[in-house]
């Protein structure tokens, strides 16, 4: 992919999250340090119960953020359809990644559609002093947790990220309010 990018092409590397770990050296040296235009389309991102304990897609956000790569992790098809063309366009330069889970779309998350923003404030509880931040299909569990906590008089707000790295100053300031 780095070789194709060095010749002006825009390669898309479609790969399971767990197998992406094995290419970390090439990501650092051949793609990231040279700021090559490569899109990593990361399948099986997040928890993948049916694939066994060695195939959990949980490490790529940590190691891709270490090298400063922008990472997007939509929570539904509408967000994926919106953000993928942007990542494939000339609007973005350098390496970038988009993650998506195994399987279909959650009906609960589908209802949120796509705002076109890098993050959304999904749930506001009066008097909340706790903020839960999540992304991808884990947002559904976090929303449920916020409602359970609310029932115990522990109000929480919930933010859903699409762009999970890097955080913008705007996001940090909003969460701190």
PLM regions: where:
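Conserved thiamine diphosphate
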Residues: 2-131, 140, 156
């Amino acid at each position: 992919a780095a070789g194709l990018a060095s010749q002006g092409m825009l390669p898309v590397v479609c790969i399971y999250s767990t197998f992406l770990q094995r290419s970390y050296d090439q990501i650092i040296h051949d793609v990231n340090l040279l700021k090559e235009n490569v899109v990593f389309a990361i399948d099986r991102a997040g928890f993948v119960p049916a694939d066994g304990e060695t195939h959990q897609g949980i490490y790529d956000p940590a190691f891709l953020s270490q090298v400063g790569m922008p990472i997007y992790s939509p929570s539904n098809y509408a967000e994926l359809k919106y953000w993928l063309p942007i990542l494939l366009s000339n609007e973005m330069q350098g390496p970038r990644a988009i993650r998506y889970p195994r399987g279909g779309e959650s009906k609960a998350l589908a209802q949120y559609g796509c705002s076109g923003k890098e993050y959304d404030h999904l749930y506001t509880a009066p008097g909340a002093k706790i903020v839960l931040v999540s992304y991808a299909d884990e947002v559904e569990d976090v929303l449920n947790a916020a409602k359970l906590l609310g029932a115990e008089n522990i109000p929480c707000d919930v933010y859903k990220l699409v762009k999970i790295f890097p955080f913008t100053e705007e996001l940090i300031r909003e969460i701190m309010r």
